[in-house]
Amino acid sequence: MDRFAALRGSLLLREFSDVGVRILAEACEERSVGRGTYAFRAGEPSTALCFIGRGTLQLQLREGGQALGELKSGDTVGNFALLAEGEHLVSAWAATDVELAVLERGAFETLRKQKPQASLKLMLALAQDFGERLREASGPLREFLAWQVSKRQA
């Protein structure tokens, strides 16, 4: 898999220059997930931002449960892993063979020291992505997210 191509195709990095994408791609590792296996399971530590280079991941609340949605080439998963420690809230099951470019928290910390501008731009892109998702959320999910944000500000 071409890590640069996987990251260049990511919506999260749409405003990055090729130089910025290359810097991030060099910090990533490649990971393959075979069809019918899990990239990660709900409750496991979330330690990396994953760029989907090829394939389809289905998100499930429980193993073998109904799919909540699908992520494909150009999508990312684990967006908060670089910003805060926590667990995966859902499981990611490979509906097809999947190729990921994985930016581990440790590699991001090294990048933060060596290339602070690129890491800051990534953090801003993650924050913008979260804001867009919050605006697009509806119903109980939107109310829950708004409550979580207001609770932290109190």
Predicted segments, located by residue:
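Cytosolic regulatory regions built on CNB/CRP/Popeye-like sensor folds
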Residues: 1-154
